[in-house]
Amino acid sequence: MQVARIMGFDIEIAPRANLIRTDQHVAYGIIAQATHSQLARLYSHAKDVLGEVYLPEAVNVQTVDGKWIPAMTYLCPEMEPRQADEEYVERIAAPALKFGFPSWYIDRIDSFRPSRAQSRKG
């Protein structure tokens, strides 16, 4: 797995992780390979159990060494905004820390924790 960033997107976790288009931000993630059946299982779970529909989108991402590569991301075009669950945010924040995402980006992820939600609104 490899760390990469995608320009023109910001992360939002409300209640699940999603990328939102913006001309002022960058989002970080992991490049991973998955089979069609693995992706189908993952996004069927998102739809059937969690109630969210994620759609594939081709993008170009930049690795930490500056190399641009084509990738697929999955976006949820219609997510009803709700408070994220503390454990869910932790499942995103822990790997971000492990893979060495920038500290400001980990702070951004942490800002979606229920314990920090009030400070984000104010």
What is the predicted role of each segment?
Residues 1-122:
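Glycine-aromatic micro-motifs
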